[in-house]
Regions:
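Structured-RNA-binding interfaces characteristic of tRNA pseudouridine synthases
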Residues: 2-227
């Protein structure tokens, strides 16, 4: 059976979901929602592979995923026609907090996770005495004074290839905890402090733990070199 390979770009608001990865105990996952729609539409189990497994409550602007459709699902349609059909299916059936922004035919060998070059995560803090009403779902409110330059100094110690086991939320992690961080950008934008991390991959809860550590430095809990 010939299986055409399709690549899609997904954006989602992760507020009410238990993360990306499908779970047996809940249907509130991003992967589970998309797979359910595809499987129902084509009358067979269709599994998708994501480039990364975002944690519960994490949002995505450009999650990459791929899946395969057997010829039997195509009903004589061209790849371009099938891509358009898939776009319409997602628009019609996905909830309003998940959107597939792009669908196209990928090469036979393309795999969204195995072909990752780098990933970028952003963590946002609203650093003011008052909360941000309209962005409250997307920013942590912390009103403590923070030294951005001290956090930047600490971030330099985290760059490069390291064993980040101490920054992993899963103590039972059996796979390698070695990762490479290419860049950490920390900047103040008005009342917001924005942390942008780029690397070859990140562990479970790693972004949250990294940010918490840098914030401790920014608040003077310990000096940058302690990182």
């Amino acid at each position: 059976i010939f299986m055409a390979n399709y690549k899609m770009i997904i954006q989602y608001d992760g507020t009410r979901y238990k993360g990306w990865q499908r779970q047996k105990t809940t249907d509130q996952t991003i992967q589970g929602k998309i797979e359910a729609i595809l499987s129902r539409q084509y009358g067979r189990t269709i599994e998708i592979d994501g480039s990364g497994r975002t944690d519960a409550g994490v949002h995505a602007h450009g999650q990459v995923a791929n899946f395969r459709l057997p010829d039997a699902c195509c009903a004589g349609k061209t790849p371009e026609e099938l891509c358009e059909e898939l776009r319409q299916i997602f628009v019609q059936y996905l909830p309003e907090d998940i959107a597939v922004t792009e669908v196209r035919v990928a090469s036979e060998r393309f795999h969204s996770r195995l072909n990752v070059v780098k990933k970028t995560y952003v963590y946002r803090i609203w650093n003011a005495d008052y909360p941000n009403v309209f962005e409250r779902k997307y920013m942590l409110h912390d009103n403590r004074p923070m030294d951005v330059e001290a956090m930047r100094q600490a971030a330099r110690y985290l760059l490069g290839k390291h064993d980040f086991a101490a920054f992993c939320g899963n103590a039972k992690m059996k796979k390698s905890t070695v990762r490479t961080i290419h860049e950490i950008d920390i900047r103040r934008i008005g009342e917001e402090i924005r942390f942008t991390y780029t690397g070859n991959g990140f562990l479970q809860n790693m972004i949250r733990i990294l940010t918490g550590t840098l914030v401790d430095v920014g608040c003077g809990v310990y000096p940058p070199e302690r990182v």
